[in-house]
From Swiss-Prot:
Gene encoding the protein: ruvB
Lineage: Bacteria, Pseudomonadati, Pseudomonadota, Betaproteobacteria, Burkholderiales
The protein's name in its UniProt record: Holliday junction branch migration complex subunit RuvB
Gene3D superfamilies in alphabetical order: 1.10.8.60, P-loop containing nucleotide triphosphate hydrolases, Winged helix-like DNA-binding domain superfamily/Winged helix DNA-binding domain
Domain notes: Has 3 domains, the large (RuvB-L) and small ATPase (RuvB-S) domains and the C-terminal head (RuvB-H) domain. The head domain binds DNA, while the ATPase domains jointly bind ATP, ADP or are empty depending on the state of the subunit in the translocation cycle. During a single DNA translocation step the structure of each domain remains the same, but their relative positions change.
Region annotation (Disordered) ranges: 1-28
Molecular functions per Gene Ontology: ATP binding; ATP hydrolysis activity; four-way junction DNA binding; four-way junction helicase activity
Length: 356
């Protein structure tokens, strides 16, 4: 059973929708994601190292009848951190309670969650790097000793009492592990970094999702969707749904390589998985800032996007694919970026392109 504590939290302001954004576009999309989500580790595709470690640690915890060590999952958005938290709870045969860092505004919010956990339950906190310091302080003794201190009363009559908690597992997820405080990071016994997926792994996910959606698809069509999905399952599933719509209206309903190509071209997703925002970023660095180095704030102002979105959502894939470099002096366009834009690289670039 999963209990969401943030179902009635205020909605964040709507973001500019990008079909290749790794963030969920809407609550409807989140519901569709849940329907496609694997339930067990053996159904989970990719992340072989993390999957193997979790399989061993979960098996050992079940044999001993103990709570699993606290788990930290980090990496770019859309790679399956929430999915893994659900799988961990399912594999352990316990309840999952789900919340997020921004929702836990006061110590009493966290205390209410912790005191309602049953033995060996899983508490999933998304965006755990956004916990407030006062809430984080309450969490430390809960993680180490399964105890919390709460204040009873007000003013001079106020007193602190210690409450014992049931053993539990905290699963924390973050896209920005560097923003976690050292005391919090050190309390996680299991730390797993989720990496971008390979096209072959994404193709397996696309074919599985197409089967669940009842969408006929060729292997070639599935691979084309996978290649343009930026290494991210959430994007792969979103593109699959868009291509399915195109196939039903413009074709016979069967997703072939040709249908996938035409649909993705209509969506302005190029063969590298780049969209307008990616190209705007590369063009800004190359044309407006002479290839860099250029600071993140200057890029954000140039393309009209928040610096946090660039750093968390747009940049990681460009860096991972070798189109952008992050240096101490700022962002620098690589030779691949110049080639992608069809622009001749500068000759005097500190030797960066001389060997190419």
């Amino acid at each position: 059973m999963t209990i969401h504590t943030d179902d009635f939290a205020p909605s964040p302001p709507p973001a500019r929708e990008r079909v290749v954004s790794a963030a969920p576009a809407s609550s409807q999309e989140e519901a569709l994601e849940r329907a496609l989500r694997p339930k067990l580790l053996q159904e989970y595709v990719g992340q072989a190292k993390a999957r193997e470690q979790l399989e061993i640690f979960i098996g050992a915890a079940k044999k001993r009848g103990e709570a699993l060590d606290h788990v930290l999952l980090f990496g770019p958005p859309g790679l399956g951190k929430t999915t893994l938290s659900h799988i961990i709870a399912t594999e352990l045969g316990v309840n999952l309670r789900q919340t997020s860092g921004p929702v836990l505004e006061k110590p009493k919010d966290l205390a209410a969650l912790l005191t309602n956990l049953e033995r060996n339950d899983v508490l999933f906190i998304d965006e755990i790097h956004r916990l407030s310091p006062v809430v984080e302080e309450i969490l430390y003794p809960a993680l180490e000793d399964y105890q919390i201190d709460i204040m009873i009363g007000e003013g001079p009559a106020a007193r602190s009492i210690k409450l014992d908690l049931q053993p539990f597992t905290l699963v924390g997820a973050t896209t920005r592990a560097g923003m976690l405080t050292n005391p919090l990071r050190d309390r996680f016994g299991i730390v797993a970094r989720l990496e971008f997926y390979t096209p072959d792994e994404l193709a397996r996910i696309v074919m599985r999702s197409a089967g669940l959606l009842g969408a006929p698809i060729d292997a070639e069509g599935g691979m084309e969707i996978a290649r343009r999905s930026r290494g991210t399952p959430r994007i792969a599933n979103r593109l699959l749904r868009r291509v399915r719509d195109y196939a039903e209206v413009k074709g016979s309903g069967h997703i072939t390589l040709d249908i996938a190509n035409r649909a993705l071209t209509m969506l302005d997703v190029d063969p590298q998985g780049f969209d307008v925002m990616d190209r705007k970023l590369l063009e800004a660095v190359v044309h407006r800032f002479d290839g860099g180095p250029v600071g993140l704030d200057n890029i954000a102002a140039s393309i009209g996007e928040e610096s946090g979105t660039i750093e968390d959502v747009i940049e990681p894939y460009l860096i991972q694919q070798g189109y952008l470099q992050r240096t101490p002096r700022g962002r620098v366009a690589t030779l691949a970026a110049y080639r992608h834009l069809g622009v001749a690289p500068p000759r005097a670039a500190g030797g960066l392109f001389e060997s190419a």
